[in-house]
Amino acid sequence: MINGSIVALITPMNSDGTVDNKSLENLVEYHIAQGTDGIVAVGTTGESATLPAKEHIQVVQQTVSFAAGRIPIIGGNGANATAEAIELTKGLSSVGVEAMLGVTPYYNKPSPKGLVAHYKAVAQSTDIPQILYNVPGRTSVDMLPETVAELASVSNIIGVKEATGDLSRVSKLRSLCGDDFLLYSGDDATAREFLTLGGNGIISVANNIVPKAFKAMCDAALAGNTEEAIAVEKSMQSLFSALFCEANPIPVKWAAHQMGLISKGEIRLPLTELSSEFHGLLLEAMKNARIEV
């Protein structure tokens, strides 16, 4: 499966709110050229919460088409209604994704029992490998390692994206889930340490705009070259913070637009464009990360 540096890809939009397919193609080509190891299409950073199911599936399908087998695509299939998640999963099963990434159901705060039932139902609706996604800061539900371990016994549930930033979970997840279960960091600020503790890869927001540096950090960390990984990480530390000055993906879309990676920085309501008070902060962080704008 996919290890290393994976981008949680933004979904570029036109001024009228429709998906900008030309910019989407440019992003896919950019990441192939920069050496990114994989793309997550229409996850949280791809504004999955504001794309209706039909459009969601179309964007993933378009991303797969643009990639043309040159880089693996993971399709987001998360929803807070199990029936909707299954609808997305069935729709994505025929478009050519390598795997799917499903966030824990948000807002309705299911119990561990509910999480297990949800993910089992989704996994049973497809043969495509499934990756769990735990990000309690956005969903208000924390999927504990013990729950992940129970789900790891399902044949096509192959890994978890863990975005709590709690590094103690890496060893616990590895112990409970076994060596073959894939562990992905979903927190850029602690990602390098996550890898050195036994993680397999990073599904990153910052990777949208610093893919070459992120790839270098991942490769060094996975190879055990800790000093090299730390040196690369230092250049991006202020960026990791600045990209969350407002709700993701507001800052990263603004930054990508400043770099010319997408034609516009449009974002769908209820999110709005980056407040002007944060422009200087983000530009300074981009400069520190050696990003030219």
Swiss-Prot record:
Gene Ontology cellular component list: cytosol
CDD domains listed in its UniProt record: DHDPS (cd00950)
Primary subcellular site in the record, as a coarse category: cytoplasm
Keywords: Amino-acid biosynthesis, Cytoplasm, Diaminopimelate biosynthesis, Lyase, Lysine biosynthesis, Schiff base
Annotated binding of pyruvate, by residue: T45, I203
Gene3D superfamilies: Aldolase class I
InterPro entries membership: Aldolase_TIM (IPR013785), DapA (IPR005263), DapA-like (IPR002220), Schiff_base-form_aldolases_AS (IPR020625), Schiff_base-form_aldolases_CS (IPR020624)
Pfam families in UniProt: DHDPS
Catalytic activity: L-aspartate 4-semialdehyde + pyruvate = (2S,4S)-4-hydroxy-2,3,4,5-tetrahydrodipicolinate + H2O + H(+)
Pathways involved: Amino-acid biosynthesis; L-lysine biosynthesis via DAP pathway; (S)-tetrahydrodipicolinate from L-aspartate: step 3/4
Subcellular location(s) of the protein: Cytoplasm
The EC number(s) this enzyme carries: 4.3.3.7
Top-tier EC class: lyase
Site positions (Part of a proton relay during catalysis): T44, Y107
Gene Ontology biological-process annotations: diaminopimelate biosynthetic process; lysine biosynthetic process via diaminopimelate
PROSITE patterns linked to this entry: DHDPS_1, DHDPS_2
Active site: residue positions: Y133 (proton donor/acceptor), K161 (schiff-base intermediate with substrate)
GO molecular function: 4-hydroxy-tetrahydrodipicolinate synthase activity
Family note: Belongs to the DapA family.
Subunit and interaction comment: Homotetramer; dimer of dimers.
Role of this protein: Catalyzes the condensation of (S)-aspartate-beta-semialdehyde [(S)-ASA] and pyruvate to 4-hydroxy-tetrahydrodipicolinate (HTPA).
PANTHER family, per the entry: 4-HYDROXY-2-OXOGLUTARATE ALDOLASE, MITOCHONDRIAL (PTHR12128:SF66), DIHYDRODIPICOLINATE SYNTHASE (PTHR12128)
Protein known as: 4-hydroxy-tetrahydrodipicolinate synthase
Species this chain originates from: Shewanella piezotolerans (strain WP3 / JCM 13877)
Gene of this entry: dapA
